[in-house]
Design a protein with these regions (language model features):
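Phosphate-group recognition and catalysis centered on beta-loop-alpha active-site segments
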Residues: 21-273
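Bacterial Sec-dependent N-terminal signal peptides
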Residues: 1-24
Length: 273
């Protein structure tokens, strides 16, 4: 047993013995559950939702003719087998490609239409704008304006829809122009004083940090600063339990169904899907 699994097992045992049930964590599917389904496809969101999952993370890009599509990568090569850049092609052109399982590139409108009648949703819309050449400032601002309006118009009354990004430019613009929105700054680092200070400077109340390297003490400090802590990536039930033990408020997973099955053994954890 490696050290991570040992720690997780010990934490689970202690929590179970003590009957702790106060901690609530919101659990959501990364790209719809990218290691269990074809990521970011409509069929993936449908399949995951059918199993009881109402929390999702997804990625939004802009085609050359100004249409929003759902894709983590700028290039279709990994998922569609074609060396094609999304931002350089029209929606009509991009819709001709298929994944190995026959799925087409999903539009934001198609995803929002699927979500419109779902209850208790938590959805992160990641703004994929870090490439400054593809998204210079003027284009970035138009992207943000259009995305905010489209998402908020489609938001069910009881849903939590938030905008996330690694791109400081996008976060800063959105918080400045749309202060009533919900935002999360993503960073490929553990929770730290530096990240807490950056979140304050960006005027966001949520941070998305790496599980690896994050300590419970750091999460406690983030909470003291009024921040909501989301941790990633989640590749296993062990990662989920580690995130719980660290005190995370939100946990993202590539294997949501596997974790949901495992959670049945941990009734002392209050998990919202």
């Amino acid at each position: 047993m490696n050290m991570k699994k040992f720690i997780v097992a010990a934490v689970a045992l202690i929590m179970g013995i003590n009957g702790l049930s106060a901690q609530q964590v919101r659990f959501f599917a990364h790209r719809g559950g990218r290691k269990e389904f074809e990521e970011n496809t409509l069929n993936t969101f449908k399949a995951c939702n059918a199993k009881g999952m109402n929390g999702f993370e997804t990625d939004v890009r802009l085609t050359s003719d100004g249409q929003f599509v759902i894709s983590h990568d700028a290039n279709l090569k990994r998922m569609f087998g074609s060396d094609v850049i999304i931002e350089e092609h029209t929606l009509k052109e991009l819709k001709t490609y298929r994944t190995k399982e026959g799925n087409e590139l999903m539009t934001l409108d198609e995803l929002l239409d699927f979500l419109k009648d779902k209850k208790g949703l938590y959805v992160e819309f990641e703004m994929k704008t870090t490439d400054v050449e593809a998204y210079p400032q003027e284009k970035l601002e138009k992207y943000c304006d259009k995305l905010y309006k489209a998402v908020m118009k489609a938001k069910p009354a009881d849903a939590t829809f938030l905008f996330t990004s690694f791109d400081v430019r996008a976060i800063r613009y959105m918080t400045g122009k749309y202060p009533d929105g919900d935002y999360l700054y993503i960073i490929g680092e553990p929770v730290s004083d530096k990240v807490i200070a950056l979140a304050s400077a960006l005027n966001v109340k949520r941070i998305g940090c790496t599980i690896e390297g994050t300590s419970r003490a750091a999460v406690t400090e983030a909470h003291k600063a009024g921040l909501i802590v989301s941790l990633w990536p989640g590749n296993s039930p062990a990662d989920f339990m580690l995130g719980v033990s660290l005190g995370a408020d939100f946990l993202c997973s590539d294997v949501p169904l596997a974790v949901m099955e495992w959670i049945k053994q941990t009734p002392w954890i209050d998990v919202v899907y």
